[in-house]
Amino acid sequence: DAQESRGLGDVYKRQDIVFEGFGGVLCVEAGGPTPGIGCAGRGIISAFEKLEELKAFEIYKPDIVIYDVLGDVVCGGFAMPIRGGYAREVFIVSSGEMMALYAANNIAQAIKNFGRRGYARLKGIILNAKNIENEQELVAKAAAEIETEVVMYVPRSGDIQTAENQGGTVSEFVQASPMVKIYQELADKVLEMSEDTKGDE
């Protein structure tokens, strides 16, 4: 990570932390502290502060911004995209495993608390399948308990690992995979459910 090889007081340029991937997608990896030292949540806060300092949003003008944040630790830093007003909608990605659903419930409770203050809203659960028994039923039940819905079912596929081993996405390296269409459908659904995009239609 960049913060591992440099001191926090060193000067960064945008190109040091913003990388362009397949299809013009820009990616920023927040990184984290040395294991056992420091707070990963604080690293996320620092990343937002640095992006603002470098005026990354104003310069790149992204159409859509997605924050991929760990859900099993709901601390102040990990909630930064919500508390800071950066995110309007939250989609929880979960399998049907017990601990994943437990984390999903915690996230839902945190979002509910933030919602009372006018922050982001929970839009639903994206089921990232692990092929466990009765998985769709388990996740549908969990979604109902937190008063939301299953937005989409994403099946487990070895094509994902095949693409990852080549350092890319299925859209780039396994174009014949049915997962390409599934991810396109998921993207369309997320766009359709996102308030910020409705005024641009």
Please place each PLM-identified region on the residue numbering.
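C-terminal boundary of histidine-terminating zinc-finger modules
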Residues: 166-177
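Single conserved hydrophobic/aromatic residue that forms the stacking wall/gate
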Residues: 1-12
